[in-house]
Amino acid sequence: MKILLINTVSLGANGISTFIINSAIGLAKNNINVTIAAINRVNRPLKDKLLANKINLKEFQGRNSSPIKYFYALKNYLIRNRFDVVHVNGNSTTMAIELLAAKSAGVKLRIAHSHNTTTEHPFINKLLRPIFEYSVNGRLACNDAAGRWLFKRKKFDV
């Protein structure tokens, strides 16, 4: 099984990153092929930690500044690498970018993982809601409030 864990914020010293890294370490220890996708250039100590734990790293640029270019780069990467699962970690329906890329690339399981109860981009969040709903087929939340906020009345797991 090949799993791609995507961070929609910078991979570094923050809560979402800690969750992703700890999850990746656990998966790798169980001999699962796991890759973390970062939207920033990751510092050397963190790269070394991932490598030491047999975790692959793919750095992407432009999620916020060039989202269409980012979408196609991610989609092409997904097609080339044939992941079974894409697990996107974020705070809003802007995860639709990654989920639609995964759906377009033929990834069977596309998980959105909600880590918050608000967004800094309410208009974009509302605009992307239909694409998000179309593309997601697995729903996780770090707590009940985060799940209710992002997934509304849809079923999700904490």
Model-derived features: positions:
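Membrane-interface segments of envelope glycosyltransferases acting on lipid-linked substrates or membrane lipids
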Residues: 1-158
